[in-house]
Design a protein with these regions (language model features):
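Alpha-helical recognition/docking segments in bacterial nutrient-uptake
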Residues: 60-64, 68-173, 177, 237, ...
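Hinge/beta->alpha junction and helix N-cap segments in small-molecule ligand-binding domains
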Residues: 67-80, 98-107, 160-170, 186-233, ...
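N-terminal helix-turn-helix DNA-binding module of bacterial transcription factors
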Residues: 1-60, 343-346
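Short beta-strand scaffold positions
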Residues: 7, 124, 246-248
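Short acidic/polar active-site loop segments enriched in Thr and Asp
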Residues: 13, 59, 120, 181-182, ...
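Short acidic capping loops at alpha-helix termini that bridge into adjacent secondary structure
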Residues: 181-182, 213-217, 267-273
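Flexible loop/turn connectors
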Residues: 233-234, 238-346
């Protein structure tokens, strides 16, 4: 069935049907719902080339990855986000354009995407403090949604984020309630906004209990298994080692676990571990009973939400930038237990 045949069945003009299918704001919701239902009932799929010609849209969304953060591409967290976003694009007949560029060429890439009309919008990843990409995208008029937030940015922008500060505050409070006082923070790179918010939550929880933070127990590195292992081994070798670790990802938490076991210790009995982002499609945190206690948020769902938000901005430009703050659940697993009494295990 083509567009003309669908319009004939509905008793509407092809232009109205096309505008309803493509999210034009001047089409009222009753008509839009009627058109969408008929398209689904008759298994109508719009011709992407025809849509591009009719609307002037590229029917594509961009994701620009600087080489400095190219490890993101093989990170299962990034992969889950892209999978969630991709599901939304596919349902709406949008393509995904993934560009890996040098850091020096990032601004030029955004400007080129805009000037050539290769994409209708972009999702911005790994926001930093006062991220210069946000005012740039506003300046060139390219619709965008930020996965995360950028503290210090004076430019209004659309974003989807997890409440990282509250998640790490709750996790630290849980460990404190178990009697732990030497709690190590294995954080991500702290030029990124999410990592700063996680450290803030950790520090807030310690301050509320009157515990002074120990710089020797706080680290900021890439969230890899190797770095988690290296940090865990170094901290456990201290004269007064931590009795608990709070890791910014399941992957770095796995490295911490390896360091614990190499010393003949048992995770959950001798040393407790809490991780973040355990709800990954291809790296599950156990089955019936979680292996790790975790602050859980679905990165895949965040990808879906960000993509839906961006497509809404593309369909109805000029609206106020929307925001969505997702809360993380605290999932109790086998990796945490009461702080050991007596001398710290070595």
């Amino acid at each position: 069935m083509n567009l003309k045949e669908l319009a004939l069945r509905l008793g509407l003009s092809p232009t109205t049907v096309s505008r309803a299918l493509n999210g034009y704001p001047e089409v009222n919701e009753t008509t839009r719902a009627r058109v969408m239902a008929a398209a689904k009932r008759h298994n109508y799929r719009p011709n992407t080339r025809a849509i591009r010609l009719a609307t002037g849209r590229a029917m594509a969304v961009g994701h620009v990855i600087p080489l400095a953060t190219r490890h993101e591409i093989v990170n299962p967290v990034f992969a889950d986000f892209i999978a969630g976003a991709g599901e939304t694009y596919s349902r709406n007949d949008y393509d995904m354009v993934l560009s890996v560029v040098s850091d020096a060429d990032e601004e030029t890439t955004y400007r080129t995407l805009r000037s050539k009309g290769n994409v209708d919008g972009v999702i911005l990843h790994a926001p930093r403090l006062d991220d210069p990409r946000i005012p740039l995208l506003r300046e060139i008029g390219l619709p965008f949604v930020v996965h995360g937030r950028s503290t210090g940015s004076a430019t209004p922008y659309a974003w989807v984020d997890v409440n990282n500060r509250r998640a790490f505050q709750r996790a630290t409070e849980f460990l404190l309630d178990l009697g732990h006082r030497r709690i190590a923070l294995v954080n991500g790179l702290e030029f990124m906004d999410f990592a700063i918010r996680r450290r803030t939550g950790y520090l807030d929880a310690l301050a509320a209990r009157g515990i002074a933070p120990d710089p020797a127990l706080m680290t900021s590195e890439e969230m890899t298994e190797i770095s988690g292992h290296r940090i865990g081994a170094r901290m456990l070798a201290q004269p007064d080692p931590p009795t608990a670790f709070l890791a910014s990802s399941m992957i770095s938490g796995m490295g911490v676990r390896r360091a614990i076991e190499e010393r003949g210790l048992v995770m959950g009995r001798d040393v407790s571990v809490i991780i973040h982002d355990d709800d990954l499609s291809y790296m599950k945190n156990g089955e019936d009973v979680p292996i790790y206690t975790a602050t859980r948020s679905s990165v895949r769902e965040a990808g879906r939400i960000a993509a839906e938000m961006l497509l809404g901005l593309i369909a109805a430009p000029g609206q106020e930038p929307p925001h969505r703050l997702l809360e993380a659940d605290l999932i109790i697993g086998q990796s945490t237990g009461p702080a050991p009494t007596g001398p710290a295990p070595r």
